[in-house]
Curated annotation (Swiss-Prot):
GO terms for biological process: 'de novo' CTP biosynthetic process; UDP biosynthetic process. It catalyses: UMP + ATP = UDP + ADP. It comes from Bartonella henselae (strain ATCC 49882 / DSM 28221 / CCUG 30454 / Houston 1) (Rochalimaea henselae). The gene is pyrH. Inhibited by UTP. It is an enzyme of class 2 (transferase). Its main location: cytoplasm. CDD domains: AAK_UMPK-PyrH-Ec (cd04254). SUPFAM superfamilies: Carbamate kinase-like. This is Uridylate kinase. GO terms for cellular component: cytosol. Homohexamer. Catalyzes the reversible phosphorylation of UMP to UDP. One of its GO terms (molecular function) is ATP binding. Pfam families: AA_kinase.
Amino acid sequence: MTLALQYKRILLKVSGEALMGGQSFGIDVSVADRIAADIAEVRAIGVEVAIVIGGGNIFRGVAVASHGGDRVTGDHMGMLATAINSLALRTSLTKLGVETVVLSAIAMPQICESFSQRKAIGYMNQGRVVIFAGGTGNPFFTTDSAATLRAAEIGADVLLKGTQVDGIYSADPKTDPTAKRFDRLTHVEILQRGLSVMDTTAVTLARENNVPIIVYSIHEKSGLAKVLNGTGRFTIVSE
């Protein structure tokens, strides 16, 4: 059995920084289009796809708190940034003919629909790509935690995190040439080793709900399809 068949329904977590490309801020449309093409490729082979996008290319809530501001307000601003990114990726997917809907944890009816579990599953059963905006809708939670929560809610077979590198390393491979890449880890090992691939809340939630995690490079063309076919470079996290 191929991974594409094993993983019928996936949730893809994309960082906001991934959308910047070579820019220092904002959205590089060509990057959004390439990520959309990768998603369309796996959708074409029957994989049901949901997506959570971060907002770090536009705003990070912790930035407000670090300058003495209110963290809750900062996180609300970050949630709005995820909505901007979600609309951008929906635009890129729509250009490819992929039916896509944005569901937000924060009500904004003129812009997108509000999230509900039943609605999300219904759209996925219809073959649409679903993008979840607004994080969890609550402050103090990362979009990694939101991705894990949504993966559990929709019954995703796996949570895929597209990052800047091709898996989980013992240290930052960009600064430490001795960093070792892991092929496989457990959720507990990530927590025990203090590996920074996801925050503790996200990893714990994934472990408690039996959600496996695959970490791969978002920058490789057709990288998502390669991972699902078992031919790419990645780290898989499962018990």
